[in-house]
Amino acid sequence: MKNYVIAIVAISTVFFSSCKASKETKSTANIYDTTWELEYISGPRIAFDGLFPNKKPQLTFDQKETRVYGNNGCNGYSASYTLDGKKLSFGEAGPTTMMFCDGGGEQQFLQQINKITSYTIDKEGKLSLNEGDVPMMRFKKVAK
């Protein structure tokens, strides 16, 4: 009888561990092959549309090159990133086309993205970039 209990506990442990691992892998995979458009940024007391009057920042994660590409609401944006489970950090941004940007959103975007330490994807499929547990930026998937 004791052997049956031990066997059931061992099988249950393996089963639940594998379910958790596959859920995390699927969630990590969701960050790739998608263009993400910013819909919220913390910090400024200016309306979101006022920060980004011409276009919203977008990001695309390249898994093979471990780089993120897109725009910061005005100029191009490109940087390396490090992803380990739910931990996420961005490297120094590469050079961009220097245009004058209305609204001040470009600087806010660059300041916030350098503070990011983790990410989550919620039930609605929205990507939150967090500083600790605090969401600093939220992105929605762009329809292709």
Segments predicted by a language model, with ranges:
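Bacterial N-terminal signal peptides
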Residues: 7-15
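Lipid interaction determinants
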Residues: 4, 17-144
